[in-house]
């Protein structure tokens, strides 16, 4: 209360400061009453019986009945304090309100607080804003104020959701052939009995037509490649050394398989071993045939 009320001491009379009161205010006179020694307390005039005011200082302090503060204010604000607006929500209280004997609340109002409140004499403070009253009033309204049509416009019915296009509809996009290719998922590495996991299988290399043509041309002349030649071909075809090496291994196995099946004639070996020519049987020398066949002159 000291932060909102300022008193001006004039001898034995205390009056409210004009900072809190309006232009036409009434002074509330208080009489000093000595309680013990230098302690002084002020009681309103007529609030305490005369017998209690003349008690001896050495007696124990008596309990006093609750008193009422009657201060009247003008409804219109003064010209000096134009920042205080006169409204039902922000008007000062106290002109026609008295202290409640049961609860002991002093209603107050101020422009610093945007609402109505009450000060409790025992040190507690209860405060309630106008917004809470409005929210409570809105909660008490029935839910029937919202028509059924508005609720349906907010949340659509279950049958109004759009359905995806079916394959039989015209708007369904046709699937291309390249979209139908099934690719096998990569195989997971299986741990061995010693706990060592084998590396996963490498992805199969898809060679282009140009790469296959160049590799077949090289295989026609040389079925076995040196490391230098293998690296040279790999760089020219944008491949690595391992890919060229594996392709030549597979190509040689394919060639041998065809020869065993008889689809291809036996071709002379290519490479360094091809320099050694083998003589056909009809070109053998006479001496070789004579030594192999028995002589006619030999006796039995």
UniProtKB/Swiss-Prot annotation:
Residues 200-259 bind DNA. Expression is abundant in the gastrula dorsal lip. GO terms for cellular component: nucleus. One of its GO terms (molecular function) is DNA-binding transcription factor activity, RNA polymerase II-specific. SMART domains: HOX (SM00389). Keywords: Developmental protein, DNA-binding, Homeobox, Nucleus, Transcription, Transcription regulation. Residues 148-168, 251-300 are annotated as: Disordered. A motif (Antp-type hexapeptide) lies at residues 175-180. Sequence-specific transcription factor which is part of a developmental regulatory system that provides cells with specific positional identities on the anterior-posterior axis. Acts on the anterior body structures. Acts downstream of meis3 to pattern the hindbrain. This is Homeobox protein Hox-D1. It comes from Xenopus laevis (African clawed frog).
């Amino acid at each position: 209360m000291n932060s909102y009320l300022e008193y001006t001491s004039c001898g034995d009379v205390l009056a409210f400061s004009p900072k809190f009161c309006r232009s036409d205010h009434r002074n509330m006179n208080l009489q000093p009453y000595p309680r013990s020694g230098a302690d002084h307390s002020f009681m309103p005039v007529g609030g305490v019986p005369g017998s209690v005011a003349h008690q001896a200082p050495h007696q124990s302090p008596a309990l006093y009945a609750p008193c009422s503060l009657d201060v009247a204010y003008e409804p219109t604000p003064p010209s000096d304090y134009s920042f205080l607006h006169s409204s039902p929500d922000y008007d000062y209280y106290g002109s026609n309100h008295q202290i409640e004997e049961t609860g002991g609340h002093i209603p107050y109002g101020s422009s610093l607080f945007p609402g109505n409140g009450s000060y409790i004499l025992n040190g507690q403070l209860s405060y309630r804003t106008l917004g809470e009253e409005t929210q409570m009033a809105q909660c008490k309204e029935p839910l029937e104020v919202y028509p059924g049509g508005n609720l349906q416009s907010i949340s659509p019915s279950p049958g109004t959701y759009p359905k995806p296009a079916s394959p039989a509809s015209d708007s369904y996009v046709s699937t291309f052939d390249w979209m139908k290719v099934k690719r096998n998922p990569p195989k997971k590495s299986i741990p061995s009995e010693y706990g060592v996991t084998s590396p996963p299988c490498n992805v199969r290399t898809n060679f282009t037509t140009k790469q296959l043509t160049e590799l077949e041309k090289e295989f026609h002349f040389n079925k076995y490649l040196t490391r230098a030649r293998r690296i040279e071909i790999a760089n020219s075809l944008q491949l690595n050394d391992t890919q060229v090496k594996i392709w030549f291994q597979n190509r040689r196995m394919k060639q041998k398989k065809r020869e065993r099946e008889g689809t291809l004639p036996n071709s002379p070996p290519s490479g360094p071993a091809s320099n050694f020519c083998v003589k056909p049987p009809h070109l053998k020398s006479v001496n070789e045939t004579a030594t192999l066949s028995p002589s006619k002159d030999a006796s039995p």
